[in-house]
A protein has these predicted regions:
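Catalytic cores of nucleotide-sugar-dependent glycosyltransferases that transfer UDP/GDP/TDP-activated
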Residues: 1-188
Length: 188
C-alpha cells in the first residue's frame, strides 16, 4: 500500500541481489531501485585468474568471457539489474570503466568507497578500543584452539569477500607461513 508520494528507495549491492531488484521493479514500480556494484562479475574473473584487466579490457568480449569462466547467469543477472535500475552506481571511476565495458551501461553516479572520519575513534578513545578488540580476538583464539593463548601472542585477522587472489588471501597465507617458520618475533 505505498504511493509515489512516499519516496521509497531500495538499495541493491552486487549481482546476487539482482533478482530482488527485478522482482521489486515488477511488483512495486513506485519504489526507486538503486543497483551498486563494487566490481563486475567478469572483472573479478579476469583478475582472479591473473589476467590483465584494465590494460586489456577493450579486447575482452563480455559474452565470450562469461562462457569461458562459466558465469553466464551471474553476468546476465548483473547486466540486467544494471540496465533495469533507476540509478546504477559503482564505487570508483576505474570500476565505472569496467561497468561500461562489461555491462554495456554507464553508471549514473560514482559513490566512493571508504569510511567517514566519524567511524574512526578519536585519539583519546583509540587505545581503549584497540585493547578491547585485542581481548575479543584472544577470547576467540582460545575458544577455537581450546587452550589458553599468551597475552602477547601475535594476533592477525583478515576479512572481506572470499576471493583468494583478488583480495590477497594467498599472499596473507604465505606471509603467515613464513612468520610461522621463521618465528623471528619470538611470540606465540
Amino acid at each position: 500500500n505505498s504511493s509515489i508520494r512516499q519516496r521509497i528507495i531500495a538499495q541493491f549491492h552486487e549481482w546476487m541481489t539482482g533478482a530482488g531488484l527485478l522482482y521489486l521493479k515488477s511488483a512495486m514500480p513506485q519504489v526507486g531501485c538503486v543497483f551498486t556494484t563494487h566490481a563486475t562479475v567478469l572483472g573479478r574473473c579476469v583478475a582472479g585468474n591473473n589476467l590483465p584487466l584494465y590494460s586489456e579490457m577493450k579486447n575482452y568480449v563480455p559474452e565470450e568471457l562469461a562462457r569461458r569462466f562459466n558465469v553466464i547467469s551471474k553476468q546476465s543477472l548483473e547486466k540486467t539489474a544494471a540496465h533495469q535500475a533507476d540509478c546504477f552506481t559503482t564505487v570508483s571511476e576505474i570500476t565505472a570503466t569496467e561497468c561500461a565495458h562489461f555491462l554495456d551501461k554507464e553508471v549514473d553516479l560514482v559513490t566512493p568507497n571508504g569510511f567517514e572520519n566519524v567511524f574512526t575513534p578519536s585519539e583519546a578513545e583509540w587505545e581503549g578500543k584497540r585493547k578491547a578488540g585485542r581481548e575479543k580476538f584472544l577470547q576467540v583464539a582460545q575458544a577455537i584452539l581450546g587452550r589458553p593463548v599468551a597475552e602477547d601472542a601475535l594476533i592477525l585477522g583478515i576479512s572481506g569477500r572470499y576471493e583468494f587472489k583478488n583480495k590477497g588471501i594467498d599472499v596473507f597465507i604465505d606471509a603467515m607461513g613464513q612468520l610461522n617458520r621463521n618465528n623471528g618475533l619470538g611470540k606465540e
